[in-house]
Amino acid sequence: MAVCIIDHDNIRGVIYFEPVHGKDKVLGSVIGLKSGTYNLIIHRYGDISRGCNSIGSPEIFIGNIFVNRYGVAYVYLDTDVNISTIIGKALSISKNDQRLACGVIGISYINEKIIHFLTINENGV
């Protein structure tokens, strides 16, 4: 399991990468964005020493997230990404090729509450 903490200006969130029932899932939530559609993209480097300017070129498009009128996005996406290959890279939230927020993807421990959340959502409840 991997996790990315986003904390840039007023944009905050937690994104998990987790295998669930044989499929890799991306899940979490993000707050602080304006209503609309945004891109989740994995970048080459996990270097955030200069914010999102030092994370390198985009490598993998994960998918779109949809921010509601309250500024909240609930993320639940399927992905073909091999989780072990993205550890140490960066995840960005972008719109119109502008990187709005980013964070480094790291290894996470298995949390029973997260597994319960995944199981509930996998079953459509």
UniProtKB/Swiss-Prot annotation:
Cellular component annotations (GO), alphabetically ordered: host cell cytoplasm; virion component
Keywords: Disulfide bond, Host cytoplasm, Virion
Listed GO MF terms: metal ion binding
InterPro entries: SOD-like_Cu/Zn_dom_sf
Cell compartments where the protein resides: Virion; Host cytoplasm
Disulfide partners: C52-C102
Keyword field contains Zinc: no
GO BP annotations, alphabetical order: superoxide metabolic process
SUPFAM superfamilies per UniProt: Cu,Zn superoxide dismutase-like
Top-level lineage group: Viruses
General function of this protein: Superoxide dismutase-like protein with no enzymatic activity.
Record-stated family: Belongs to the Cu-Zn superoxide dismutase family.
Protein name: Cu-Zn superoxide dismutase-like protein OPG175
Origin species: Variola virus (isolate Human/India/Ind3/1967) (VARV)
